[in-house]
């Protein structure tokens, strides 16, 4: 008799995706982040659901309701901090996942890659809207500053901002709609993630060498299921250390002050995972130019398949490209640091140089290095 997992309409989909899936035998721990992102998403949906049961999306009670969750709801504090720090873990996994894709040339699977970029944008939008919900000082002013950027769009900008706000400033209407969007977006992300997997399973996974692994495949279960479980345990360990020992390490103290439209905080800054893009935005003196640079800093990922000039897929055997890749990582860390600093000398010039380096590395230096490497190999 044929196994039910191979005949049942639902089970055979699960089977072909997670059990009998032929996977390359040499994929390293860098391939764990896909499953970790799935776990992060499930964790965020579950903790978010329980938070939504006690949260009120109204300017007069939002801040108090978050305080109530932390003080009066059974284990509310741990749910709240798991959700807040879960977002940080989500972005750590996202950056690692994208970095892996860049290093090993996974972007040559263009459909999978482009859905991934859309997923990144959707996750960033969700995180931004979630940050507004506690209605602290940084929530309010962050929402004001970031939504105001849309006013840089010629002709329709101002109308667009007022339409998003639902009035003439960030107020009750804004908070209510942000809560509605923040609730629905993770489910859209989950649907997109399934499409992401669907496209991936059309081609199969890449591997560290970037060479076809058709000749050497192993079943996903038990080899990679056990490996993913190990990754998940390490992720949960890291998250719980953060939640239980220093839950406010990555947060902003200003968010423990209720939102006050009459009092601007001295340094308005987003959560740490947006600081690199925020630094690029601030490094351009022109408003529209800054907004374009901000969007392009992420949208540039779409161009990666077009900028691939090497005759090898992976960077595994390309030392010059490897060197530039790690310079890019260092540059992004520099931008992250600058994004959290006040707008004054020497931070302004460092931010501008790091922003120029970011675009220069991706658009010019890395494609040039690939061409040089091709010639060195006499291809």
Swiss-Prot record:
GO MF annotation, one: ubiquinol-cytochrome-c reductase activity
SUPFAM superfamilies given in the database record: a domain/subunit of cytochrome bc1 complex (Ubiquinol-cytochrome c reductase), Transmembrane di-heme cytochromes
InterPro entries to which the protein is assigned, alphabetical: Cyt_b/b6_C, Cyt_b/b6_C_sf, Cyt_b/b6_N, Cytb/b6-like_sf, Cytochrome_b, Cytochrome_b_C_euk/bac, Cytochrome_b_N_euk/bac, Di-haem_cyt_TM
UniProt key word Cytoplasm: no
Any GO CC annotation of this UniProt entry: respiratory chain complex III
Residues annotated to bind heme b b566: 97, 196
Positions with a binding annotation for heme b b562: 83, 182
Membrane topology category: Multi-pass membrane protein
Highest taxon of the lineage: Eukaryota
Primary localization class, coarse: mitochondrion
Keyword Iron attributed: yes
Cofactors named for this entry: heme b
Annotated a ubiquinone binding sites: 201
Pfam families noted in UniProt: Cytochrom_B_C, Cytochrome_B
GO biological process terms held by the UniProt record: mitochondrial electron transport, ubiquinol to cytochrome c
Residue stretches spanning the membrane: 33-53, 77-98, 113-133, 178-198, 226-246, 288-308, 320-340, 347-367
Cofactor comment: Binds 2 heme b groups non-covalently.
UniProt record similarity statement: Belongs to the cytochrome b family.
Function: Component of the ubiquinol-cytochrome c reductase complex (complex III or cytochrome b-c1 complex) that is part of the mitochondrial respiratory chain. The b-c1 complex mediates electron transfer from ubiquinol to cytochrome c. Contributes to the generation of a proton gradient across the mitochondrial membrane that is then used for ATP synthesis.
Protein name as annotated: Cytochrome b
């Amino acid at each position: 008799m044929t196994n039910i997992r191979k005949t049942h309409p639902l089970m055979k989909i699960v089977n072909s995706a997670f059990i009998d899936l032929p996977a390359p035998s040499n994929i390293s721990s860098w391939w764990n982040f896909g499953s970790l992102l799935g776990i992060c998403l499930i964790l965020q949906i579950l903790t978010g659901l329980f938070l939504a049961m006690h949260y009120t999306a109204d300017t007069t009670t939002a801040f108090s309701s978050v305080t109530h969750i932390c003080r009066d709801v059974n284990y509310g504090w741990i749910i709240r901090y798991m959700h807040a720090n879960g977002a940080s873990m989500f972005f750590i996994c996202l950056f690692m996942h994208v970095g892996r894709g860049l290093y090993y040339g996974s972007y040559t699977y263009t459909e999978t890659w482009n859905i991934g970029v859309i997923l990144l944008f959707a996750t960033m939008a969700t995180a931004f809207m979630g940050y507004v919900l506690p209605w602290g000082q940084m929530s309010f002013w962050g929402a004001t500053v970031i939504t105001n950027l849309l006013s840089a769009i010629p002709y329709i900008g101002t109308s667009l901002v007022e339409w998003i706000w639902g009035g003439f400033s960030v107020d009750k209407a804004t908070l209510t709609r942000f809560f509605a969007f923040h609730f629905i977006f993770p489910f859209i992300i989950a649907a997109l993630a399934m499409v992401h997997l669907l496209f991936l399973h059309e081609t199969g996974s890449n591997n560290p060498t970037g060479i076809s692994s058709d000749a050497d495949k192993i079943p996903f279960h038990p080899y990679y299921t056990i490996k993913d479980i190990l990754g998940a345990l390490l992720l949960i360990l890291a998250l719980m250390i953060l939640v239980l020992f220093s839950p406010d390490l990555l947060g902003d103290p200003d968010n423990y002050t209720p939102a006050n439209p009459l009092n601007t905080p001295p340094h308005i800054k987003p959560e740490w995972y947006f600081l690199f893009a925020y630094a690029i935005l601030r490094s351009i003196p022109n408003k529209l130019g800054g907004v374009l640079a901000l969007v392009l800093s992420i949208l540039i990922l779409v161009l990666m398949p077009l900028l691939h000039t090497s005759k090898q897929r992976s960077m595994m055997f390309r030392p010059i490209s490897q060197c530039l890749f790690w310079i890019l990582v260092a540059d992004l860390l520099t931008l992250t640091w600058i994004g959290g600093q006040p707008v004054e000398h020497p931070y302004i010039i460092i931010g501008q140089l790091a922003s120029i380096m970011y675009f220069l590395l991706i658009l010019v230096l890395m494609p040039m290095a690939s061409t040089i490497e091709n010639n060195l190999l006499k291809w």
